[in-house]
């Protein structure tokens, strides 16, 4: 029997997916279950999206391979989104699309992380960061945030964990799983700290649109220098 590689053998299954599968099994048994596992919306896909997908199929727009970085119209729409939401002036050449944020993050770590590079991850965090970084032969470094500070990352905490091997900081805001948000001043402090310490920021903003009472803030919108030092998911 073929042997699984040592690299993959070190990787643990996704805890959230395991919880989700268990919840499905219990529901199938007739149990009343409230699942707090995967971040899955409780509403259907908006009809305008469904109709656009059907229309693209009928027009045979999906019959062929797309450009490696994604469909031009989609990349241009992403530029427009960030201009409208954050005032960020993006060019199409600065945008790449992926089959989901998980694959985008995996591609980022495989592209930027060399063996032994350290990647800072504030706790609590989305479980797959760890496995993806380890697949890239990087070293996840977990920052112990504090409940009394709403689990927020601070410059003081960053100073405790940074070393000469630190390559990246993963910042997830709005946060999965805590839901925390940062103020503009807090993000600016983190962004400037990253510049000072030559640490590149991977800003995971996939919950950007799921904030309803206050505006979301993108790390890349704070200054041109921080923009140049940030990759937004």
Residue ranges and their predicted role:
Residues 141, 146-218:
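Active-site phosphate-binding strand-loop segment of PLP-dependent enzymes
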Residues 2-100, 107:
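N-terminal small-domain helix-loop-helix segment of the aminotransferase-like
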Residues 26, 136, 196-197, 226:
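Helix C-cap/helix->beta junction micro-motif
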Residues 197, 214-233:
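Conserved active-site segment immediately N-terminal to the catalytic lysine
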Residues 111-133:
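Conserved PLP-anchoring active-site segment centered on the Schiff-base-forming lysine
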Residues 89-95, 115-118, 165, 227-230:
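Short acidic capping loops at alpha-helix termini that bridge into adjacent secondary structure
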Residues 135-141:
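A short helix-loop-beta submotif of the ANL/AMP-binding
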């Amino acid at each position: 029997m073929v042997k699984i590689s040592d690299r993959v053998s070190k990787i643990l299954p996704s805890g959230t997916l395991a919880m989700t599968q268990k919840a499905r099994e219990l529901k199938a048994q007739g149990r009343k279950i409230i699942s707090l596992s995967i971040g899955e919306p409780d509403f259907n896909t908006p009809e305008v999206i469904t109709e656009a997908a059907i229309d693209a199929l009928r027009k045979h727009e999906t019959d062929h391979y797309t450009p490696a970085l994604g469909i031009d119209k989609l990349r241009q729409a992403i530029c427009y989104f960030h201009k409208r939401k954050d005032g960020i002036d993006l060019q199409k050449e600065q945008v790449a699309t992926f089959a989901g944020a998980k694959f985008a993050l995996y591609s980022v770590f495989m592209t930027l992380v060399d063996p032994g590079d350290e990647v800072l991850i504030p706790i609590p965090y989305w479980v797959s960061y760890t496995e993806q970084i380890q697949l890239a032969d990087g070293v996840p470094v977990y920052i112990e945030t504090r409940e009394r500070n709403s689990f927020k990352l601070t410059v003081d905490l960053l100073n405790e964990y940074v070393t000469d091997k630190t390559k990246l900081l993963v910042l997830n805001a709005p946060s999965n799983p805590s839901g925390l948000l940062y103020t503009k001043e807090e993000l600016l402090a983190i962004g400037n700290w990253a510049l000072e310490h030559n640490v590149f920021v991977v800003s995971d903003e996939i919950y950007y649109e799921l904030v309803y009472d206050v505006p979301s803030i993108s790390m890349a919108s704070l200054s041109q220098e921080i923009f140049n030092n940030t990759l937004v998911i």
